[in-house]
């Protein structure tokens, strides 16, 4: 098993890409600290993970609440002694064209998608530094690379995640901590289910492979970056988009 003995913290762990990653990590023997804002979704996740080789340990976690993050991270380290892998996956959308976007919608997306990644990473990294080992995987988006009309806030947040990924890769390499990002395209998740049919058709027409991706396909790449198989990979942004950005 590729993550046997590893303690892995995943945010946004109870739906979409986060859920698929949590279940895959548990299948690969990890102890998964599943952080999510929804207790109901966490309860469902734990039931689904029953019988897997690893373990799912759920925590209600809001990535905008620094006090709560600190408390959860301290509890995890006290209980398990370490955090080997961090997957920053929690994210939201509040779409609108630039001239119609409300300031509160800008703030909400930036606070979760960008500052939330900063918040959790800043709390976890000191323990990885003490261990002199760790892998951080940030979930960005192809929208952070090429932009998308109606997603000023989302594009800015995901571009910022890429910038932080590359900066942290340089800062932390000397402590044997690797930092990478994935940039999913259109993936079948609760977030993309909200797309109008016309928008879905337009998106599909731009994807060379002719379909939306599955959360499990993103999870497989996150697993590679989290595992020792990618021990010489850091500062990279891996597109998982069916050829969208070719």
Curated annotation (Swiss-Prot):
A single GO molecular function term of this UniProt record: NADP binding
Q: Which residues bind NADP(+)?
A: 62-63, 89, 154-158, 187
Tell me which residues bind substrate. 141
InterPro entries, per database record: 3oxo_ACP_reduc, NAD(P)-bd_dom_sf, Sc_DH/Rdtase_CS, SDR_fam
Q: Which PROSITE patterns match?
A: ADH_SHORT
Q: What is its EC number?
A: 1.1.1.100
What are the protein's UniProt keywords? Fatty acid biosynthesis, Fatty acid metabolism, Lipid biosynthesis, Lipid metabolism, NADP, Oxidoreductase
Pfam families (alphabetical): adh_short_C2 (PF13561)
Location of the active site = 154 (proton acceptor)
Q: What class of enzyme is it?
A: oxidoreductase
Glycosyltransferase: is it a keyword of this entry? no
Which pathway does it operate in?
Lipid metabolism; fatty acid biosynthesis
Superkingdom per UniProt: Bacteria
One BP annotation, GO: fatty acid elongation
Is Lipid metabolism given among the entry's keywords?
yes
Catalytic function, reaction form: a (3R)-hydroxyacyl-[ACP] + NADP(+) = a 3-oxoacyl-[ACP] + NADPH + H(+)
Subunit-level organization? Homotetramer.
Which family is annotated? Belongs to the short-chain dehydrogenases/reductases (SDR) family.
Q: What does this protein do?
A: Catalyzes the NADPH-dependent reduction of beta-ketoacyl-ACP substrates to beta-hydroxyacyl-ACP products, the first reductive step in the elongation cycle of fatty acid biosynthesis.
User: What is the official name of this protein in its record?
Assistant: 3-oxoacyl-[acyl-carrier-protein] reductase FabG
Say which species the protein is native to.
Thermotoga maritima (strain ATCC 43589 / DSM 3109 / JCM 10099 / NBRC 100826 / MSB8)
């Amino acid at each position: 098993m590729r993550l046997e003995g590893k303690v892995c913290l995943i945010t946004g762990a109870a739906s979409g890409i986060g859920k698929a990653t949590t279940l895959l990590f548990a299948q690969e023997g990890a102890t998964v600290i599943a952080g999510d804002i929804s207790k109901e979704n966490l309860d469902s996740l734990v039931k689904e993970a029953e019988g897997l080789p690893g373990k799912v340990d759920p925590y209600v976690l809001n990535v905008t609440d620094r006090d709560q993050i600190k408390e959860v991270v301290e509890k995890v380290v006290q209980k398990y002694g370490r955090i080997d892998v961090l997957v920053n996956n929690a994210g939201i959308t509040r779409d609108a064209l630039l001239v119609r976007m409300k300031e509160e919608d800008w703030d909400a997306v930036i606070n979760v998608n960008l500052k939330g990644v900063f918040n959790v990473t800043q709390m976890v990294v000191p323990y990885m530094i003490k261990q002199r080992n760790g892998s951080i995987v940030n979930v960005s988006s192809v929208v952070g690379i090429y932009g998308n009309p109606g997603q000023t806030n989302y594009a800015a947040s995901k571009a910022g995640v890429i910038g932080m990924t590359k900066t942290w890769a340089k800062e932390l390499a000397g402590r044997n901590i690797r930092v990478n990002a994935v940039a999913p395209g259109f993936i079948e998740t609760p977030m993309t289910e909200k797309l109008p049919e016309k928008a879905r058709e337009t998106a599909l027409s731009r994807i060379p492979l002719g379909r939306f991706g599955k959360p499990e396909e993103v999870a497989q790449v996150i697993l590679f970056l989290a595992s020792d198989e990618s021990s010489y990979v850091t500062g990279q942004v891996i597109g998982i988009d069916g050829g969208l950005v070719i």
